[in-house]
Structures are given as C-alpha cells and as structure tokens.
C-alpha cells in the first residue's frame, strides 16, 4: 500500500492545530472513500498523532481508500493551547472535522482518551451529519464519562479492546457497552497498546471498514 503524507496547520478554538493528512495512492480518476479523523491517547501521558495505535488505524483506513487526518490535541506538539480534560479537546476535534472534512463521507476513530473524545464528537455530530464508520479502541471508560453510541450507529461502529488491558480494564468497557447492547470485539491477551498485535488490530479494522453498514 502506498500513501502520501502531508503536514497541515488548521485553525482551532485555542489556536493553531498541528495535523497530518495521509492519502491513499488511487488510480487516475478515482476518488477517496471519504475522510477519517483519528484522535490520539492522553496528552499528559505522551499521546500524540504519531502514537503507534493511531498510525495503525490510519493505515487501515488508507488501505480501504479513505483519506485520514491525524492531529495533535491542544498543548501537544505544535498545537497551541493547554490540556482541558476533554472539553477543549472535543472542540479541537470538531474544528478539525469541519475544516478537513466539510462535506462528503466522514469517519471518526480514536484510541484511549481519543476514543472518549471521539464518542462525544459522534454524539455532537450524529444528528446533523451521520458518520459512515466509527472505530473506538481501548476506550477510556474507567477514567472518563464516555458518551453512548447512538442506537442507529451501532452497525457502523467497531469497539475494540484488549482482554488484558491494565490501563482501562475490559470490565469498564463492558459496563459502558452493556446498557447499550453494543458489541465489543475483544483481542485475546491484548494489552492497552496492543504490543505484538498491531497487525491483528489493523486487520480487524480493515474488516469492519470493508463491511456494509
């Protein structure tokens, strides 16, 4: 798979937002399937747009013909502002979506803290603009109040979690998903960062992206 990478500077509520756009090398005349916005893990614990899980998600989307935009939340890298416990970060994500994907098919994905922020972006955007695909990995349900996934978005949503995640226990994600009857795909033996299992993670995401709604 060949991909083209471009660095972007977008405008956010706290100032400039550093972002990277990864595009699939498409045949002449072919259009991308849409734009996928991918959110990184907790900024105060080293989370950036270059996180390995985030990059794996981007590769999966690009393989399936999507253009992806990974970005740094406020206070990370060259993105201006300071950490805001998810409130400002939600506004960052919404600003990125508005500028990088103003129209056409949209997908949202996030890892850990990024999955928490993504859940609230889905909640905010679903009524005016339904996403084609949603991917939540290592969702930080034990540390933050994760928004429920809209019922009519369940078939478009993939929730992935490691069986042996010691950062966000699997039980916390099951407790969040159970009232929604939202399926959770569990990676046997998987930890929070899916060490040694990133190829499997990618394949599971690709399978989801290739499935119907």
Label the predicted regions.
Residues 10-12, 16-103:
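Serine-hydrolase catalytic machinery in alpha/beta-hydrolase-like enzymes
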Residues 41-42, 134-144, 190:
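Active-site nucleophile loop of the alpha/beta-hydrolase fold
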Residues 108-110, 137:
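Short beta-strand immediately N-terminal to the catalytic nucleophile in serine-hydrolase-like folds
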Residues 110-118:
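Gly/Ala-rich beta-loop-alpha elbow adjacent to hydrolase catalytic centers
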Residues 142-143, 163-168, 192-193:
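Acidic catalytic loop of the alpha/beta-hydrolase fold
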Residues 153-161, 165:
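Short beta-strand/loop motif that positions the catalytic acidic residue
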Residues 163-182:
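Conserved loop-alpha-helix segment in the C-terminal half of the alpha/beta-hydrolase fold
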Residues 190-202:
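Catalytic histidine-centered segment of alpha/beta-hydrolase-like enzymes
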């Amino acid at each position: 798979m060949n991909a083209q990478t471009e660095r972007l500077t977008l405008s956010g509520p706290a100032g400039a937002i550093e972002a990277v756009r990864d595009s699939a090398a498409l045949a002449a005349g072919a259009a991308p399937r849409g734009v996928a916005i991918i959110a990184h893990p907790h900024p105060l614990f080293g989370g950036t747009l270059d996180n390995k899980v985030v990059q794996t998600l981007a590769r999966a989307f690009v393989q399936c013909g999507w253009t992806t935009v990974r970005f740094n939340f406020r206070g990370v890298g060259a993105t201006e502002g300071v950490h805001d416990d998810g409130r400002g970060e939600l506004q960052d994500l919404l600003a990125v979506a508005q500028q990088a994907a103003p129209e056409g098919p949209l997908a949202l994905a996030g890892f850990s803290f990024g999955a928490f922020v993504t859940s609230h972006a889905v909640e905010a955007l679903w009524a005016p603009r339904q996403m084609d695909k949603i991917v939540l990995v290592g969702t930080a349900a034990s540390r933050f109040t994760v928004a429920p996934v809209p019922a009519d978005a369940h078939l478009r949503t993939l929730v992935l979690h490691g069986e042996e995640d010691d950062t966000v226990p699997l039980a916390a994600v099951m407790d969040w998903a159970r009232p929604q009857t939202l399926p959770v795909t569990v990676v046997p033996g998987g930890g929070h960062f899916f060490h040694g299992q990133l190829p499997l993670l990618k394949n599971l995401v690709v399978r989801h992206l290739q499935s119907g709604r």
